Amino acid sequence: GESGIQVDEPHWPSASAGVTDVPDFVRDLTLPIYQGHGDRLPVSLMPADGTYPLGTAQYEKRNIALEIPVWDADLCTQCGKCVFLCPHSAIRARAFDAAAAKDAPPTFKHVPAKSKDFPVGTHISYQTAPEDCTGCGDCVEACPIHDKSNVSRRAVNMAPIAPLLDQERDNLAFFLRLPEFDRGAIKHNTIPSAMLLDPLFEFSGACAGCGETPYIRLATQLFGDRMLVANATGCSSIYGGNLPSTPYTVNGAGRGPAWSNSLFEDNAEFGLGMRLAADQLMIYAQQLVKEMAGEIGGDLAEAMVKAEQREEAGLYEQRGRVALLLEKLVASNHPRPKELASVAEWLIRRSVWIIGGDGWAYDIGFGGLDHVLALPYDVNILVLDTEVYSNTGGQMSKATPIGAVAKFSAGGKATAKKD
């Protein structure tokens, strides 16, 4: 007889259920892979040069959290620690003129900025991305504020997502439409202020509660609009660039980090090559500017070549000069305007970052790292030191402390951490 049990074919949920307006690339390539249909895609859809657009992790909307953080605006001191510690950029802070919130949804929270660094009338909001949060609770643990009458209540508290999902989705959509506050008016050297800068690393596939990603996100907040990243293989290359999406994204002007992953052992040299290439392109662009000074205008040409670009204000001014230069090149009769136009963006100084874990920095890539450190070039090196090979399951590295138990050192590591 019949058992009466029906076995249904497994069905992948549609990743596009909550997404209505996506770029063609995401619709044609990314979403089918999300839905488990990557094997049906023709090779002709793949990028011929291997480059993929940024900002595609925002379309995943994984909805994996059972609870999400809820901001208590009355208790909050606006310290920014919840935003700083969030591994997935699922809590955002933004400063804006109070008038910008006149059409906000009724449940959208915002309060006057406590810092005297902002103009009168500036408001601040802390907003959760409910469908991108992993529910790890790092934000609650980081919050230093307790209600004196109820110590279990903080300025950020976890709450079940079900009754909040629709309203917080609407609140997030409004929050993201608010204009980004002037970067030049924000202090970059304090956590409360720096957390008001838009992150250009969001919604990665890193483990819930990851301790690595906040540092990468912070780097993108400070330098992301001109950032070149050489990423060693490991956790950071998996959550940073695994198909079909990337958490690196762009700002409102379309600028964001350029990210690439090369051989594990060659990452330091790879990043050094980015620095040398960026410097050479800048030198070449400056030479063309000097040659065309008569067409461009002597004052503009001199200002571009001698621009100080160590601070936000200098970078802002140089971007304005480059925009003006490109306008002039369109009308130029000089035989080389197209050539200069193709390299004009390199007149803006790039921030080169070499990123990897301790397995790369202490072990497999140490020789190259030592070589790069000994050279006088301007590179930034971020070592995500977890003291084991995290991506492959927790094996001992030379960063593992003496006596620590890890894979390959079950009896405790016999030697001290490499200095």
PLM ranges: what are they?
Residues 1-133, 140-353, 404:
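Ferredoxin-type iron-sulfur electron-transfer modules and their immediate structural context
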Residues 239-240, 339-419:
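Thiamine diphosphate
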Residues 80, 137, 213, 366-367, ...:
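Residue-level marker for well-ordered alpha-helical positions
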